[in-house]
Amino acid sequence: MGEHEYENLWEYFKPSAQLEHAIKQLSIDAYCAVRGTGYGRIDIRMDKATGKMYVLEVNSQCGLSEDENHTSIGAMVRLGNEKFSDMLGAIIENALQTKLKYIKAAKFINK
């Protein structure tokens, strides 16, 4: 292996509908527990033997690269059959809507 290469110690797969629902709920619960806002990534690992899932971290500063060798987002988007550009657009739209709410609230308070 080269200086900046590593072996993936995990695998990405398209979950069943039931598992996808459980992952989404666990992610929402973890994000709400830390009062997350905006874009973030919830790192979860699942014990293959038991099926139990564990939240490793809520990452609010995760990378945004389509290249699966640099960040996991590329694999997630690919497995979700989404376009990377659509995901970025949704992140930007959410950030703008959030900022607009703060601006409107500040104008109301300063009247």
Regions found by a protein language model. Give the residues of each.
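A long amphipathic alpha-helix within ATP-dependent nucleotide-binding catalytic cores
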Residues: M1-K48, K99, I103-A106
